[in-house]
Amino acid sequence: MGGKWSKSSVVGWPAVRERMRRAEPAADGVGAASRDLEKHGAITSSNTAANNAACAWLEAQEEEKVGFPVTPQVPLRPMTYKAAVDLSHFLKEKGGLEGLIHSQRRQDILDLWIYHTQGYFPDWQNYTPGPGIRYPLTFGWRYKLVPVEPEKLEEANKGENTSLLHPVSLHGMDDPEREVLEWRFDSRLAFHHVARELHPEYFKNC
């Protein structure tokens, strides 16, 4: 008896079962597609390119051939609290994000790299609206967006070698409030979900 589900065919199942049991919940603040992944283990028809901005954006990246493969090399999953904290620490240790001027293009590149290498669906890096400091909606992500001081902007735009297309020279064109923002690490964001306190309306379905 046993057929195709005999003992020999389920080698490794205990490890898979244990991995499923230990699967972490999605972090507070991730998007609808990540909630699908958490609940069903896949993105369902309730989140498609037609009705979900993150799905539509990802599909567009795949069509554009953005410079590296956009199909993840690991299983697709939602961003978790622990993963967001660990990723924040990794980027802080490696450098490169702290004080970097934010632009949508730079955020897209970061999201795609994380999606490709870690499998986290790119609907987790969202922030509270401005003006002023923008706090991450995803609990555990320890980078906030902070307006750059006018003096620092003035200094950065001096000289003939300034690129007009550099985010610091675009004077906040990416931002609804026309503020130039930079990523800033804040260790307290691992313990204090500021976005949830400021905007509880964003978390009604969490």
From Swiss-Prot:
Residues 62-65 are annotated as: Acidic. The virion-associated Nef proteins are cleaved by the viral protease to release the soluble C-terminal core protein. Nef is probably cleaved concomitantly with viral structural proteins on maturation of virus particles. Myristoylated. InterPro entries: HIV-1_Nef_anchor_sf (IPR027480), HIV-1_Nef_core_sf (IPR027481), HIV_Nef (IPR001558). Gene3D superfamilies: HIV 1 nef anchor domain, Nef Regulatory Factor. The record marks 20 as: Might play a role in AP-1 recruitment to the Nef-MHC-I complex. Residues 108-124 are annotated as: Mediates dimerization, Nef-PTE1 interaction. A motif (Dileucine internalization motif) lies at residues 164-165. GO terms for cellular component: extracellular region; host cell Golgi membrane; host cell plasma membrane; membrane; virion component. Induction: Expressed early in the viral replication cycle. Keywords: AIDS, Apoptosis, Early protein, Host cell membrane, Host Golgi apparatus, Host membrane, Host-virus interaction, Inhibition of host adaptive immune response by virus, Inhibition of host autophagy by virus, Inhibition of host MHC class I molecule presentation by virus, Inhibition of host MHC class II molecule presentation by virus, Lipoprotein, Membrane, Myristate, Phosphoprotein, Secreted, SH3-binding, Viral immunoevasion, Virion, Virulence. A motif (PxxP) lies at residues 72-75. Its main location: host cell. The record marks 57-58 as: Cleavage. It is a lipid-anchor. The modification Phosphoserine is found at residue 6. GO terms for biological process: symbiont-mediated suppression of host antigen processing and presentation of peptide antigen via MHC class I; symbiont-mediated suppression of host antigen processing and presentation of peptide antigen via MHC class II; symbiont-mediated suppression of host autophagy. A motif (Diacidic) lies at residues 174-175. One of its GO terms (molecular function) is GTP binding. Residues 148-180 are annotated as: Binding to ATP6V1H. The N-terminal domain is composed of the N-myristoyl glycine and of a cluster of positively charged amino acids. It is required for inner plasma membrane targeting of Nef and virion incorporation, and thereby for infectivity. This domain is also involved in binding to TP53. The SH3-binding domain constituted of PxxP motifs mediates binding to several Src family proteins thereby regulating their tyrosine kinase activity. The same motifs also mediates the association with MAPK3, PI3-kinase and TCR-zeta. Factor of infectivity and pathogenicity, required for optimal virus replication. Alters numerous pathways of T-lymphocyte function and down-regulates immunity surface molecules in order to evade host defense and increase viral infectivity. Alters the functionality of other immunity cells, like dendritic cells, monocytes/macrophages and NK cells. In infected CD4(+) T-lymphocytes, down-regulates the surface MHC-I, mature MHC-II, CD4, CD28, CCR5 and CXCR4 molecules. Mediates internalization and degradation of host CD4 through the interaction of with the cytoplasmic tail of CD4, the recruitment of AP-2 (clathrin adapter protein complex 2), internalization through clathrin coated pits, and subsequent transport to endosomes and lysosomes for degradation. Diverts host MHC-I molecules to the trans-Golgi network-associated endosomal compartments by an endocytic pathway to finally target them for degradation. Monomer; cytosolic form. Homodimer; membrane bound form. Interacts with Nef associated p21-activated kinase (PAK2); this interaction activates PAK2. Associates with the Nef-MHC-I-AP1 complex; this complex is required for MHC-I internalization. Interacts (via C-terminus) with host PI3-kinase. Interacts with host PACS1; this interaction seems to be weak. Interacts with host PACS2. Interacts with host LCK and MAPK3; these interactions inhibit the kinase activity of the latter. Interacts with host ATP6V1H; this interaction may play a role in CD4 endocytosis. This is Protein Nef. It comes from Human immunodeficiency virus type 1 group M subtype B (isolate HXB3).
